[in-house]
């Protein structure tokens, strides 16, 4: 799950086709959980520097269920889409934060995406 999400979020940042995976179609459906108009506000609330990736912990939004976890993935993907170039961004911190927030729901996410763990 971690590798899939890393590849997906990096792909959303620059659309590098070498990162593309058919599973991304399923993950892109999560975009509906975050309004495009909210992305600028979310970025502002993250107080990001030019080299930051999505810093979800700065949003102070708890992850209490699978829907919250899906929303965090969608926020990460949409913010990644709208921020600087991949090579300039410190992704490791962003992924550490994201996974710490949603790892409890990895099994549920796998079932939701694939129908099994």
Curated annotation (Swiss-Prot):
Gene3D superfamilies: dsDNA poxvirus. It comes from the Viruses. Pfam families: Poxv_Bcl-2-like (PF06227). InterPro entries: Orthopox_N1, Poxvirus_Bcl-2-like, Poxvirus_sf. GO terms for biological process: symbiont-mediated perturbation of host apoptosis; symbiont-mediated perturbation of host defense response; symbiont-mediated suppression of host NF-kappaB cascade. Belongs to the poxviridae OPG035 family. This is Protein OPG035. The lineage of its organism: Viruses, Varidnaviria, Bamfordvirae, Nucleocytoviricota, Pokkesviricetes.
